[in-house]
Regions:
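Membrane-spanning beta-strand positions in outer-membrane beta-barrel proteins
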Residues: 2, 6, 74-76, 129-131, ...
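Gram-negative outer-membrane beta-barrel transporters
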Residues: 8-146
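Residues that define the transmembrane beta-barrel architecture of outer-membrane proteins
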Residues: 56-60, 113-117, 161-165, 178, ...
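Residues on the lipid-exposed face of transmembrane beta-strands in outer-membrane beta-barrel proteins
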Residues: 62-66, 79, 119-123, 167-171, ...
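A cross-taxa feature marking solvent-exposed loop/turn segments within ectodomains of secreted
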Residues: 70-72, 160, 175-177
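C-terminal beta-signal and adjacent terminal beta-strands/loops
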Residues: 85-86, 134-147, 171-225
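Short, contiguous acidic/charged loop-to-helix segments that flank catalytic cores in large enzymes
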Residues: 104-110, 152-160, 208
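Generic long, charged, amphipathic alpha-helical segments
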Residues: 134, 143-168
C-alpha cells in the first residue's frame, strides 16, 4: 500500500494573461476594442495581454496505490486526484475574488472545478494487460445570467459533475527479436454525455473539462524493438 499526500501553495506576481472579452464588454461596452455593426450588433472584441496583479492558489494532491497477486495475475488499484482550495484573482474593484468552483466566463481564469479524480484497476497476466479507468470531475457553476429560452429548456447555472470510464486491453507477443503489442480500447465506453453549459447565445459545453465526442473505440499495433 502506498499513500501520497501533497499540499501546495503558489503566489504568482505580475501574471501575464490575456484579457477577458466578456469582461471588456461588461466594463466598457462602447470601448474601441468592442467591434459592432452600424445597428449596434456585437461582432467581435479585440483582446490583448496584460500583467495581472498577484494570483494566490493552494490545494491538495493525493494518490493511493495498492497491488496484490491473484490466480489470474497481478492486480494494481489506484486513486489519484487534486482538490483546489482557492484561486484568488483581482477583480475590477481592486479586491480579490476566489474563483474556484466557477466557469469563469468573465475573467482571465479558466474553468475551475474543485476536485478531479481518477480511479484505476489494472490486471497484468503474462502477455495480457487489462486496464480500467474512471475519471470524475466535480460540479461547478456559471455566473452568466440565463436567458428565458435557456430557463424554458431546463438550464440552470449549475454545471453537473461528470464521470467517464475508459477501458483498454493489450496483448504483447514476441516476433523474431522484437515484440508486437496489439491494443483494443474505448474512451468513455458508457457514452456519458458532457454536461451542458449555457454560454452566451450558445447551448454549449466546457471543452477545457469535458469531452463531447461520446464513446470512442480504437485499435492499435506497436512494434517494440
Amino acid at each position: 500500500l502506498e499513500i501520497k499526500l501533497d499540499y501546495w501553495s503558489i503566489d504568482y506576481s505580475d501574471v501575464i494573461t490575456i484579457e477577458s472579452a466578456q469582461g471588456i464588454v461588461a466594463a466598457t461596452p462602447l470601448a474601441p476594442a468592442v467591434k459592432r455593426t452600424i445597428d449596434g450588433t456585437l461582432i467581435g472584441v479585440t483582446t490583448g495581454y496584460f500583467n495581472a496583479s498577484n494570483v494566490k492558489t493552494d490545494g491538495i494532491d493525493f494518490e493511493v496505490n495498492y497491488s496484490f497477486d491473484t490466480s489470474f495475475g497481478d492486480v494494481e488499484l489506484g486513486l489519484s486526484g487534486s482538490h483546489m482550495n482557492k484561486y484568488e484573482i483581482p477583480n475590477a474593484k481592486g479586491e480579490t475574488q476566489d474563483v474556484v468552483g466557477l466557469f469563469n466566463h468573465d475573467n482571465f481564469a479558466r474553468s475551475l472545478p474543485e476536485t478531479k479524480m481518477t480511479l484505476s484497476a489494472i490486471l497484468n497476466s503474462g502477455p495480457h494487460k487489462l486496464a480500467l479507468y474512471g475519471k470524475h470531475i466535480s460540479d461547478y457553476k456559471t455566473t452568466r445570467a440565463l436567458s428565458d429560452t435557456a430557463k424554458s429548456r431546463g438550464y440552470t447555472q449549475k454545471i453537473d459533475e461528470w464521470f467517464s470510464v475508459d477501458l483498454q486491453y493489450n496483448y504483447t507477443f514476441d516476433m523474431d527479436d522484437n515484440q508486437i503489442r496489439l491494443t483494443l480500447g474505448g474512451i468513455n465506453i458508457l457514452d456519458e454525455d458532457a454536461p451542458l453549459v449555457f454560454d452566451a447565445a450558445n447551448f454549449s459545453y466546457d471543452s477545457r473539462q469535458h469531452d463531447i465526442r461520446g464513446r470512442i473505440m480504437y485499435v492499435g499495433i506497436k512494434l517494440i524493438r
